[in-house]
């Protein structure tokens, strides 16, 4: 969880932790809160996020002709670059890739580099083609579209994510901006496997490409409901798993 909180610092300054979420749910005894939490960590919600992302390209962009000194790109040219040449770049990083392409083209033709000040002006022109680059707001659109309570519309300093939203927002961040793959990690060990959700395993599989050892006891969980992760792990890891089930305990309890 601490890793997720650090990754989200540029989006929200604070996140509810797992234990505060459990305590809040126990106090309120609200079945809907528990169900909503499980829904947002599920395979179905990942599907909703992917559907939302598929339509976001058109809703998030406001293309316009770029003209700055010798750099000139029409709206039509930018649309073609966005949807074809750079279609595989993450959505919120795509205009940066197009900007670099245009700047490189200009600098090659004129034989000189743009200054830092000029590059900032060009970057600002490209950034203005996004309706917003604020992932907090974009996640709010997703919640509204899916029929969930929306996030408070507040400035950065007053934002706080409930625990149920932490990993959906992290997933959205990685899909929109790209993710760092931790290639220096050679083997990952995950304990208490039963306390990780479908969505958490999807994120782990995206950022760690090494072999993993995943350990746990499905009968021991922080959640009220028992979660058998072995039901979905083969799908997350494309069947590339070797399962060992130990039916006898060697634990000594004093």
Annotate the PLM regions.
Residues 39-187, 197-201:
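Conserved helicase NTPase catalytic core signature
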Residues 26, 48-49, 61, 95, ...:
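Detector for methionine-enriched segments
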Residues 10-18, 24, 65, 114, ...:
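Generic preference for flexible, low-structure residues
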Residues 3-11, 149, 154, 173-187, ...:
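Conserved helicase motor core of SF1/SF2 NTP-dependent helicases
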Residues 1-61:
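P-loop NTPase motor core
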């Amino acid at each position: 969880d601490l890793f997720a909180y650090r990754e989200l610092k540029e989006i929200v300054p604070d996140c509810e932790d797992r234990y505060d979420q459990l305590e809040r749910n126990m106090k309120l005894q609200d079945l809907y809160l528990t169900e909503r939490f499980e829904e947002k960590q599920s395979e179905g919600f990942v599907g909703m996020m992917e559907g939302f992302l598929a339509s976001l390209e058109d809703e998030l962009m406001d293309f316009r002709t770029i003209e700055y000194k010798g750099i000139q790109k029409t709206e039509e040219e930018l649309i073609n670059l966005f949807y074809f040449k750079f279609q595989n770049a993450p959505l919120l990083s795509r205009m940066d890739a197009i900007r670099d392409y245009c700047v490189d083209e200009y600098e090659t033709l004129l034989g000189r580099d743009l200054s830092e000040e000029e590059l900032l002006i060009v970057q600002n022109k490209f950034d203005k083609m996004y309706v917003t680059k604020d992932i907090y707001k974009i996640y709010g659109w997703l919640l509204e579209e899916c029929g969930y309570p929306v996030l408070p519309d507040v400035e950065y300093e007053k934002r706080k994510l409930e625990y149920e939203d932490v990993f959906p927002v992290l997933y959205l961040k990685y899909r929109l901006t790209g993710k760092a793959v931790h290639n220096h990690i050679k083997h990952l060990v995950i304990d208490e496997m039963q306390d990780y959700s479908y969505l958490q395993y999807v994120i782990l599989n995206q950022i760690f490409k090494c072999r993993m050892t995943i350990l746990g006891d499905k009968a021991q969980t922080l959640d009220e409901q028992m979660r058998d992760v072995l039901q979905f792990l083969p799908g997350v890891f494309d069947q590339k798993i070797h399962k060992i089930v130990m039916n006898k305990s060697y634990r000594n309890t004093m």
